[in-house]
């Protein structure tokens, strides 16, 4: 099965291109791992999840599709990896880095750092096409929602607060596996 990062890597232009994904929602999409810190470096033939000491152990347990590395200084780790893999062009998500972060990245890396909409467009296109597993999970979530709605209708009565109804609904769907 092709992983999400491999689908993204297949869009990279030949000749030393890589992508750096930093937004929390796209990091989670590519890795399946929720965290408030980290980034994903996508190369044509490899991918790395880079994070700090707070998340590295959990990341290594949960992320199987790419290598997880702990950094002390992100720019140093990125420089080492981009040099090792011969990266001459690094695409970053538009609007995800401060000007200072982008400037520091450009000063640290030997190749070009590009922050146009190209990477954002690729990520959006990948997320639009659902995998069989994503479709299965969407169907399961929809079935749980329908079940909860059907059952909660019997519980709703005058005098019940929204909070009571919300708690009962949560209990109903959690009992079913949500």
Regions found by a protein language model. Name each.
Residues 1-49, 56, 75-79, 83-86, ...:
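Terminal domain-start leader segments
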Residues 22-24, 51-53, 72, 92-97:
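Structural motif
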Residues 34-36, 64, 104-107:
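Short, glycine/charged-enriched secondary-structure capping and boundary segments
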Residues 55-58, 101:
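Short, charged N-terminal beta->alpha structural module
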Residues 58-65:
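A short, polar/proline- and glycine-enriched secondary-structure boundary/capping micro-motif
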Residues 67-69:
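A short acidic, glycine-rich active-site loop
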Residues 73-178:
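Flexible, acidic/His-enriched mid-domain "rim/lid" segments that flank
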């Amino acid at each position: 099965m092709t992983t999400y990062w491999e689908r993204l890597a297949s869009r990279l232009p030949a000749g030393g291109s890589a992508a750096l994904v930093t937004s929390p929602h796209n990091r989670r999409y590519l890795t399946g791992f929720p965290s408030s810190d980290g980034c994903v470096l996508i190369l044509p033939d490899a991918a790395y999840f880079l994070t700090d000491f707070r998340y590295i152990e959990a990341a290594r347990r949960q992320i199987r599709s790419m290598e997880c590395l702990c950094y002390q200084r992100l720019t140093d780790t990125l420089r080492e990896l981009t040099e090792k893999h011969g990266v001459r062009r690094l695409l970053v998500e538009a609007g995800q880095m401060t000007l200072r972060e982008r400037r520091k990245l450009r000063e640290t890396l030997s190749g070009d750092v590009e922050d146009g909409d190209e990477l954002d467009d690729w990520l959006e296109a990948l997320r639009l096409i659902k995998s069989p597993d994503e479709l299965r999970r969407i169907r399961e979530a929809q079935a749980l929602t329908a079940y909860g709605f059907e059952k909660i209708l019997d519980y709703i009565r005058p005098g019940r607060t929204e909070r009571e109804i919300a708690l009962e609904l949560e209990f109903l769907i959690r009992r079913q596996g949500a």
